[in-house]
Amino acid sequence: MAETIIVRECQFGQVRFMYGDLTKEEGDILVTPANNRLAGREGVDEVVHQAAGPELRKHTHGIAVERRKENLPPCGVGEAVITPPFSLPHSSLIHVVGPDCRRPTQDNDRRELLKAAYASLFERIGEIENRGTIVLPPL
C-alpha cells in the first residue's frame, strides 16, 4: 500500500500525492510513462509491464507492428495510447510518451512535447467511460 504524502481538495474532487507501488493502487485508470516503442523496458513502465503480465507486451508489440506498417513509431513523443490492463487491478491502462531528458535533440522542444503529452493523455482519459480515479505518476 502506498503512503499518502499530501491530500488536497479541488473543484473536481481530491488530489493525493503518494509514494509506493502504483501498480497496486486502486483506481479506474493507470497511466504509465512509456517510450516511443511501447517496450516497457525501463523505469515505471517496466514495473507496469511486469505487473500486467506477458499479455501486455504482446499487445503493445501488436500496436507497434500495425503502426510500423504505416511508417509510424508505435507511439510518438507527445502521444498516448490506451490498452487493456491485463493483470493490473485497473479498468484501463494509458501509455504516454513524454520527452526524454536524455535526448539532446528534444532539448529545444521539451516544454511543447510535454504539453502535447499531457494533452494527449487527457484526450485518452476523455475516451474512457469509467474514469473516477486516475493513478498518474509524473511523466
For the regions a language model picked out, list residue spans one by one.
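Macrodomain-like recognition of ADP-ribose-binding/processing modules
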Residues: 1-139
